[in-house]
């Protein structure tokens, strides 16, 4: 009995030790982020991260515990082979999760969840486009080496039998003792006997989010995310549904008051519309907003010539979330993406569908893979009639990691505009891709690789608009220039508010005059605002608000996997969803947006559940 109990405890605490040691490795790998931390900070991270390590170790020790019980009844070699196979699989899975998390954190700024699985299986090529061949190769080699090291440790400590375990005389007693020990794993797995079960918030201990992120066990984070993907009506339950309904009713678009009038931004109600959705752009690239000079020179020019929304925010952090925000006025979700569920996107209203009913001809242009993240099904269900994507360009023109570079994309669009008879009015959605990792572009104006890629994308947009101005279509065209999500420059940004600020600019012959709109808004508000300007109904867009309506509440709302933000003129608030605590609270009315932000997210998941 004693040997089996020792082996059981050794298995459990070996898993714990391996998880604990991953934390300083993570911090050393990202030493640029942790340059000013002390040795004591390393130990604090390891200590506070223990709850998740203990929990996951409990899950992983359950099967070895059952095998030890079985070994009290038979010494069959099958048990040894199962044991060897189990630890081999676990070593490989642990290595894959740790190395993938190590590689992705630098791009995404949060620990591994189930998101990469969706991206990879929707389009493996595009999922890998952000990184170089050598980065992938080094990652694979690192996984294999780390898996081999883990298995060697498991073999030396747990698998190799110096003296095979004998079948005990009192096997019933041994089995009962091991069964009780295995059952006791429920305690660390669940996190104790309190009402709340184990979750990521258990390891949050610092106001410095770097420390909290380092304390997270990436394997637990991935498992938790994967097992909580679809129970939307159980997620983010902050308050009684009636209270959430009451608060949400204050945050939706309102009828125009009798004493108010909506400022008309356009000189026509049926302009041709071209959306240019700019990959990863941010206000930090524009001198207009106090950002980098001499980078987005055309966007700076458009900001002066057109209608600039100066307090505008990205709804989320990835294209699949951002596109749904722009086109359907649907907020990004922290734990999933509505694009994963075609049966739900089929039921969402969209700008293209509304414009199609108004007689618009609809087209979508993208140099990359339109099947990435289920984009094609979303676009088709939104009413898009013609989709131009990477497969529509010859191989010689698909020189970028994401497919056709931006200048090729705009050349194709201009060619189609000139050669094909345009049915007016039309809507064209144009999505750029070159200003994305790995930032490799056929353009060399700036020394900084990242800034140069944005300058390239900006030049492509500028060249296209300049050519378009020379066509008869210009006079009756509205351009909507907006990034697909939060910006990729600079990185990292410690203040989450700064990371979400993006430009929204309207230009074209269809606008009345240049204007700066300083109302707080986000991508979800484009739908209601545009349709209102066109005199079209937008009641179906539950979460979208008309920015120009004085009677409507004005706020920006955004999410990432670990927080939401609600921004108004008097309160800028960010709430950490992992730690269940306020992460940032600024303005003259601190805390004013907390309950509203919670209610908004709760109602978003209510809506997601019933779709």
Residue ranges and their predicted role:
Residues 136-138, 242-247, 379:
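Long, well-ordered, tryptophan-enriched scaffold segments
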């Amino acid at each position: 009995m004693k040997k089996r109990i020792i082996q059981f405890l050794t298995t459990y605490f070996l898993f714990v030790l391996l998880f604990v040691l991953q934390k300083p490795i993570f911090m050393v790998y990202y030493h640029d982020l942790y340059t000013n931390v002390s040795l004591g900070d390393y130990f604090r991270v390891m200590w506070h991260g223990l709850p998740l390590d203990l929990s996951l170790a409990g899950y992983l020790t359950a099967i070895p515990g059952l095998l030890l019980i079985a070994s009290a009844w038979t010494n069959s070699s099958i048990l040894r082979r199962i044991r060897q196979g189990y630890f081999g699989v676990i070593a490989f899975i642990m290595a894959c999760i740790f190395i993938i998390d190590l590689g992705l954190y630098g791009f995404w700024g949060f620990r591994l969840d189930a998101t990469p699985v969706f991206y990879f299986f929707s389009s493996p090529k595009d999922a890998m486009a952000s990184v170089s061949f050598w980065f992938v190769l080094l990652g694979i080699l690192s996984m294999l080496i780390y898996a081999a090291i883990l298995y060697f440790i498991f073999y030396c400590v747990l698998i190799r039998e110096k003296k095979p375990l004998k079948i005990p005389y009192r096997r019933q007693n041994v089995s009962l003792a091991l069964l009780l020990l295995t059952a006791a794993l429920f305690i660390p797995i669940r996190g104790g006997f309190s009402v709340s079960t184990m979750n990521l918030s258990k390891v949050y201990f610092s106001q410095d989010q770097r420390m909290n992120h380092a304390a997270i066990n990436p394997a637990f984070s991935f498992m938790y995310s994967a097992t909580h993907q679809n129970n939307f009506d159980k997620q983010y339950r902050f308050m009684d549904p009636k209270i959430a309904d009451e608060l949400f009713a204050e945050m939706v678009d309102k009828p125009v008051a009798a004493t108010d009038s909506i400022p008309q931004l356009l000189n026509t109600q049926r302009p041709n519309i071209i959306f240019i959705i700019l990959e990863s752009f941010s206000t930090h690239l524009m001198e207009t907003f106090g950002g980098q000079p001499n980078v987005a020179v055309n966007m700076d020019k458009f900001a002066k010539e057109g209608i600039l929304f100066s307090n505008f925010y990205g709804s989320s952090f990835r294209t699949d979330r951002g596109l749904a925000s722009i086109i359907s006025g649907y907020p990004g979700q922290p734990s999933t993406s509505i694009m994963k569920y075609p049966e739900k996107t089929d039921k969402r209203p969209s700008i293209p569908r509304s414009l199609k009913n108004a007689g618009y001809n609809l087209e979508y242009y993208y140099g990359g893979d339109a099947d990435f993240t289920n984009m094609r099904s979303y676009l088709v269900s939104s009413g898009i009639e013609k989709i131009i994507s990477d497969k529509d360009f010859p191989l010689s023109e698909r020189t970028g990691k994401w497919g056709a570079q931006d200048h090729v994309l705009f050349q194709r669009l201009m060619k189609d505009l000139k050669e094909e008879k345009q049915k007016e009015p039309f809507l064209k959605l144009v999505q750029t891709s070159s200003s994305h990792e790995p930032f490799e572009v056929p353009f060399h104006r700036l020394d900084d690789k990242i800034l140069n890629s944005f300058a390239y994308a900006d030049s492509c947009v500028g060249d296209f608009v300049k050519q378009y101005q020379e066509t008869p279509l210009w006079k009756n065209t509205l351009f909507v220039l907006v990034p697909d999500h939060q910006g990729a420059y600079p990185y990292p940004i410690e203040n989450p508010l700064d990371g979400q600020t993006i430009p929204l600019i309207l230009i074209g012959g269809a606008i009345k005059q240049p204007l700066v709109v300083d109302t707080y808004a986000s991508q979800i508000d484009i739908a209601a605002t545009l349709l209102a300007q066109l005199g079209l109904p937008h009641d179906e867009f539950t979460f979208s608000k008309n920015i120009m309506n004085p009677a409507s509440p004005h706020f920006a709302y955004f999410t990432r996997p670990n927080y939401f933000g609600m921004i108004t003129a008097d309160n800028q608030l960010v709430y950490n969803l992992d730690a269940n605590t306020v992460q940032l609270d600024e303005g003259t009315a601190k805390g004013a947006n907390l309950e509203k932000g919670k209610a908004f997210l709760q109602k978003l998941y209510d809506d997601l559940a019933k779709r």
